[in-house]
Amino acid sequence: MEQIEQMAKEIERKFLVDQGLLPKKIIGEEYIQAYIAINDQGIVRIRIKGSIALLTIKTSEKGMTRNEFEYEVPLEDAKSLVELFNDKIIYKTRYKITIDKKLWEVDEFHKENKGLWLAEIELESENESFSLPEWIKKEVTGDQKCFNAYLSENPFKFWNNE
């Protein structure tokens, strides 16, 4: 039996975005994410971006570091899973912006989460320093409401003016 490698550590910080201050000519990619399992231990999701489909497992941990493991899966299988788990879906456009050699992933949410914009930056360590772009409003790292899994069950449109 093949030995499974240890899961990769994901260290990221998350922020609310003022979309009016974003660069004007950025190109995004459409994402569909269906959540297969969400519980206190973590999440299992299927993601479709273009012709690529990924099955992701993330553990639930406090702070900005989590375990993450990701597998590419056949696109048709992913589409079937999205249809099966169609009650917990996120639709978004992801824009990638590099600032000071660091990649920012900015998500514009659609449908039930329209109006919400979030940015993430992955870091090498929890203490790594980086520059905040002018379009960052507020840090929301660790705020469960800003996790995609939470948004799949509690859409932004139902939040009370937050």
Residue ranges of predicted features:
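Phosphate-end processing signature that detects enzymes handling 5′-triphosphorylated RNA
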Residues: 1-162
